[in-house]
């Protein structure tokens, strides 16, 4: 392809049972010359069959559809015809955001709430998201295994779980673990946290996610993690064995006293920003930091991880083979500041080793 040649339009299947919403969505997408709607489905069974026959570049999926629901359609599509999926969810309250989070765990690349009013800004962002994810290589997900993981209490209750009264961290005898993720992150984070039951250090996480789904992410992570998981609150003192998730649209940082600092000003394009977290850990934890950059689009976190590397912290990046999207880890890799590039299943053990090596033995 010559430098001036254009890609063919992104072929999209729209899954939406509301005639009004479906017509609006099709019109919004096809206002972009680089997007073409090639099929429309109103039920889960129609969606599964249509994706299998048309092999589109992208699927937009409503979760509230007949014949099994959007989660069922997603599981079947990702098990049999893996396709980049953008979930449009009308469930945005704290209690009802769980389906959108489970969709992300089950393989959807993005989840956004349906607007009450379709603004030009939302429509433009929607088209941009479709164009962005069209070229993502998605992996096959075993049917039903990933998205339904949180709903297996028998399995989760068998995991060792940290006491909810986690002790205040002793800065002289501990370290700080900072993790950043974007597209594909919830599944990767769950895999890592399940292997950190014995960790005696605080964990701070930046996950790029729509603000409406942040509380749902915390609730879901709390069900699958052996550690205590909380939404970060400004001024909190870091506690060993506690996982702090950045609130939606808010930067998560630590202070010199190892307290939580939340900043809601738009310092960077991303909010929360991985760079903001990593840079604060580099400044205030220095060689007692462990930085981890996971799957995700773009380059957020690369500069911050470089700062951690310069300060003597351990830096870890997910490898390409196990990343849903290799953008963020690759950006860090290109800077030459990654100490260990690892497949997802090996990252938890590397964090434990790194934390132990950075924790002084009391005399």
Residue ranges and their predicted role:
Residues 1-11, 18-30, 34, 40, ...:
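Conserved acid/base catalytic micro-environments in cytosolic active-site loops
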């Amino acid at each position: 392809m010559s430098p001036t040649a254009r890609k063919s339009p992104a072929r999209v299947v729209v899954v939406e049972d509301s005639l009004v919403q479906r017509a609006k969505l099709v019109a919004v997408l096809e206002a972009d010359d680089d997007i073409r709607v090639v099929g429309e489905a109103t039920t889960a069974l129609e969606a599964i069959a249509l994706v299998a026959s048309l092999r589109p570049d992208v699927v937009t999926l409503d979760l509230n559809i007949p014949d099994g629901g959007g989660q069922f359609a997603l599981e079947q599509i990702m098990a049999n015809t893996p396709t980049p999926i953008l979930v449009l969810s009308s469930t945005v309250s704290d209690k009802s955001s769980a389906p959108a989070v489970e969709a992300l765990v089950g393989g959807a690349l993005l989840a956004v709430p349906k607007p009450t009013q379709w603004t030009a800004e939302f429509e433009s962002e929607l088209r941009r998201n479709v164009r962005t994810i069209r070229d993502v290589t998605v992996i096959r997900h075993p049917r039903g295994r990933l998205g339904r993981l949180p709903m297996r209490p028998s399995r989760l209750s068998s995991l060792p779980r940290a006491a909810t009264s986690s002790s205040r961290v002793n800065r002289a005898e501990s370290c700080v673990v900072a993790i950043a993720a974007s597209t594909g992150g919830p599944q990767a984070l769950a895999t890592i946290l399940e292997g950190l039951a014995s960790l005696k250090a605080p964990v701070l996480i930046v996950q790029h996610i729509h603000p409406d789904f942040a509380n749902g992410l915390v609730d879901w992570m709390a069900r699958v993690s052996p550690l205590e998981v909380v939404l970060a609150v400004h001024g909190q003192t870091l506690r060993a064995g506690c996982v702090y998730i950045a609130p939606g649209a808010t930067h998560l940082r630590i202070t010199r006293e190892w307290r939580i600092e939340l900043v809601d000003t738009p310092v960077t394009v991303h909010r929360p920003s991985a760079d903001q977290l990593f840079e604060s850990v580099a400044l205030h934890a220095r060689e007692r930091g462990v930085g981890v950059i996971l799957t995700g689009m773009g380059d957020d976190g690369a500069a911050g991880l470089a700062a951690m590397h310069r300060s003597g912290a351990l830096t870890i990046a997910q490898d390409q083979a196990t990343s849903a999207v290799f953008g963020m880890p690759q950006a860090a890799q290109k800077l030459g500041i990654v100490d260990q590039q690892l497949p997802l299943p090996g990252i938890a053990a590397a964090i434990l080793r790194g934390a132990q090596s950075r924790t002084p033995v009391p005399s």
